[in-house]
């Protein structure tokens, strides 16, 4: 659409193409972190609210192994759980709100796993996704990181570090 408008204005396409090729999202905003063992790993740690998580779930190809949780900061957790349920193959939940999310999802989803610690949830998500062909692990928590981290950036870095360590282990002889 942008190229059509650019052409309509009779402007050269080269600068538009150059700008498009140089564009990238900031870290932890629906970024493809790794792909191995038939699984793609997406880091959307910035998604600290329901709307952002729902947008990510709409953007990532199914089947989705979702990593959700953290610290609730208001909003209707039960209604949010019902909205995400239809997008998920598996829910891997963690943190202060993990148990509450699991209860809200139990009538809508068969595969729900709850962990206290974030890194355990990431490892479990990778293991569970490996059993589902062409799956996507999506960290798009929907809640703040402050139960275990200083910021969403720190949570995103932890996700990346854990995923890359798992990738190294898969490639090790």
Where are these regions (language model features)?
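Short glycine-rich anion-binding loops that position phosphate/pyrophosphate groups of nucleotides
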Residues: 48, 70-73, 97, 138, ...
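Phosphate- and divalent-cation-binding pockets in alpha/beta enzyme and binding domains
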Residues: 52, 100-103, 148
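Hydrophobic, well-ordered secondary-structure elements that form the walls
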Residues: 30, 66, 91, 101, ...
